[in-house]
Structures are given as structure tokens and as C-alpha cells.
Amino acid sequence: MSDLNKLGLAEARDLLRKGDTTSVELTEACLKAIDGADALNAFVHKTPDVALDRAKAADARIAEGDAPAMCGLPIGMKDLFCTKGVDSQAASNILKGFKPEYESTVSQKLQDAGAVMLGKLNMDEFAMGSSNETSAYGNAISPWRREGDETPLTPGGSSGGSAAAVAADLCLAATGTDTGGSIRQPAAFTGTVGIKPTYGRCSRWGIVAFASSLDQAGPMTKNVRDAAIMLEAMCGHDAKDSTSVDLAVPNFEAMLTGDIKGKKIGIPREYRMDGMPAEIAKLWDEGAAMLKAAGAEIVDISLPHTKYALPAYYVIAPAEASSNLARYDGVRYGHRATLAQGDGITEMYEKTRAEGFGHEVQRRVMVGTYVLSAGFYDAYYNRARKVRTLIKKDFEDVFAAGVDAILTPATPSAAFGLGEMNDEDPVKMYLNDVFTVTVNLAGLPGISVPTGVDTQGLPLGLQLIGRPWDEGDLLNTAYALEQAAGFVAKPAQWW
């Protein structure tokens, strides 16, 4: 069977169980696709030997009849996850050559479930970015192009390599992480599905930290069913992460009935921003109409503190980043600068960080250090934390009033061209996160579902936000939206 790499997780799982294909065949198809897609710069560390060894082991396990759902399925791993003996550098020069001695909990769970790791995926450096342009590996490039235009487009960020790889059928699915929208925005830009689960649902242990109170891992897949299958394998309690919650993990796939009759879907009026492109507003209205036609009740809701979310996020996230990134000092691991005669420890720190950190990371570390400094701690950091509490309360009030899920746009536009925002004020790039950061600040689950295309043929996504710990219900609502939207567009192969 040709084109095995074009399958989704559920389809491939069913073929494996029937004996119609093998994990080795699936893996070889993906490895061939990866080797033919260097122009996308999605896979930055290829691990064909690891992949084929795991595929052979998975085939043996399937033959014995004790295989979990993910067994034998080839996936990509975002470079933010530590993978034992395999380069894990968070797309930063400061971690060049770093091969961890341990495996992150999420990647270990996937490995234990029999998933096959094809390699590590490009991303924004330390997950700081919305376009995959801050990577030490160079830009990841979207497989999508505007109709009649060869301008290379961003796959989004920070999980840009994951989104590009899934959209281009280089793997069946991929892991991502989401601190302010880094799963959902790239998914929307590439016509894929991305879910950020409730904060604490997936362990953060072994994931290189950006902002510890916001970071959360999740799957990036070709459809909602695949997201349900992969999320179940990724989450679960981990004693090594103090924020990991000890809750039973439901069978998310079994909850996908598509029945949303009587569900209350909230439409937040504050998300209708000035200058919102007509295409995004129209898509949002169409999405609400689709859910209504499926039997849901659409209600107008208010999230009054929404306008403060972006500034609060861009105080809290850099503050936590400046603390987390203090560990990269050239002493224990990663890059160490060459020192001049007479240089001491201070010069080693300065030179190592100047050489190792890219501009955006340096900017965020500086902002974070500033807002945590003695004179500004109360004015910025403490105030942002108070705003965060109010944003969380807004959502709690809406859910307490009986709303089951909230529908919003995922992004303020379709994918933009690489370099298009480079000369701009960085705040313009930060505005890409305007619809997604509230979900991280409130610790809620959010999913991006491809729902349509713009006038130039580029994919557009809508976001659904769910109650905490209710990913099953959220996935089912997303499944109903996916069925109604009937999105099947794929990028035309140019690479």
C-alpha cells in the first residue's frame, strides 16, 4: 500500500490490527517522506535507526495481541522534549549537542504505548515565538502556499515544525507544547488539529521549561479522533511533576459521539476585536451556526477582563522565563563560550549567554528580569498575577452559569509570510496570541479545529475552550464541529 504516511492515527491503528500493514512499513513510508521534505526544515534531528528498532518491537507486540492504541504509530517529537541519547536542544545554540541522560515523562509514556519516534521537530527557540523564526535551526516552512504565490509562509509557532510535519504527512501525528497558543495557533495555520489540555493533565517533567505555570504538552494531529487517541496516551499523573494532577484518564476516543444536543456554547463578545478581518468574523459566525444546527444552544457571554490578557501574559511569561533560563550558564551542560585571558565567572556567564541565546530569548529574559526587579515587582508582576486571577474568575463564572464550551477564532489571520513581521514592533507578532493566551492564564483546555479556508486557499481554524478536566466533552464538541465543517483541504506538494 502506497502513501502510508498520509494516514491518520486511527486509520493506521486499524490497518495494523487487521494485519494489512506493519509498523515497519508505516515507519519506512514516513522516513522516506521526511527525507524528501528537507525544504520544509521540519525534522531537525532524524532518528531512523531508533524508529525502525521501535517499529520492529511494536510489530512483535501487535502480533502478541497486547498492543495499546498508539502501538506502532510513527510520530514526530518537538525538540523541547528531552529524549534520552537523542539531541534535545530546544532549538537553541546554548544547548547545542545536548543529549539528555533521561526521557521526558510524556515521550516515555508514548514510547511505553509503543509509539515510534521518527525524530525531533523544529520550533521557536525555547518555545518563544509565534512563527518558528527564532529557531537556531533556521525557519520551519509551511507546506501551504497562497494560491498563485510562492512566498514561503510560516507554519506558526512555537510548535511550527510539528504543525508543518503533520500537515505535510511526514508523520502521522506530533507532540507540541503550548504556553500561550503554541499548539493551537500553528494547528490553525496548517489545517491540523491541536489540543492544549488542562494545566496539570500532562506531566511537564523533562520538557525544557519556558513559563512553568503556563506550559502544557499536547498532541498535534490530522483530525479530532487522532487527538483523542494520542492525548490519552500522553496524560496521566506523574509524581516527578508537582503540578501534575492525580486524576483518572478517560477513554477520550470513546466519548466522540458527535452528539452535542442541548450543549450551551458561549460566544464571548470581547473577542470581537476592532479590525478583525471579515474572513475571521465570518468563519466564527459560520462555526456557531454549524454547532447550532447540530443541536447546541448558542449564547452570548462576557469575559470582561479579556483586554488585559495579552499584557498580563507578556509580563508573567517572561518573568518565569528569566528565572527558568538562569540555569543556562555554561557550567554544567550545553554551550560554553571561549574565554579570554583574565576572564572570570561573570565573563563566562555573559559571553555564554550572548552567544547561546537568540535575540527574542534575550529580549524576553530582559523583560522578565525588569518586571521582577525590586522597583517594578508590584507595578508589573504582582499586578499581572491579580489580572490573571480575574481572567480565571471570568471563565469560572461563565461555566458556573451552565456554559459547556466557548467558541472563538484561533488566530487573528491566516498564516503570514516568513519575514513579514520581522521589522515590526515585536508587539505586532505578540498579537498573534490574542485569542489563545487567556486559556493558558486560566489553565483551561483549548482545541483548534480547521474549519475553512481564506480567499487565497489558506486554512483557518476555530478554537473551542472547555471546562477544566473535561477534555472528553471538549473533544466531542470539536468532533461535532469538524464533522459539520467537513474540512478536507491539503497543501499541494511543492517541496
Curated annotation (Swiss-Prot):
This protein's record includes keyword Transferase: no
UniProt GO BP: translation
Domain of life: Bacteria
Gene name in the database record: gatA
Role, per record: Allows the formation of correctly charged Gln-tRNA(Gln) through the transamidation of misacylated Glu-tRNA(Gln) in organisms which lack glutaminyl-tRNA synthetase. The reaction takes place in the presence of glutamine and ATP through an activated gamma-phospho-Glu-tRNA(Gln).
Keyword annotations from UniProtKB, A to Z: ATP-binding, Ligase, Nucleotide-binding, Protein biosynthesis
EC number, as in UniProt: 6.3.5.7
SUPFAM superfamilies given in the database record: Amidase signature (AS) enzymes
One of the record's GO cellular component terms: glutamyl-tRNA(Gln) amidotransferase complex
Protein name, entry field: Glutamyl-tRNA(Gln) amidotransferase subunit A
Organism: Ruegeria sp. (strain TM1040)
Pfam family, any one: Amidase
Lineage: Bacteria, Pseudomonadati, Pseudomonadota, Alphaproteobacteria, Rhodobacterales
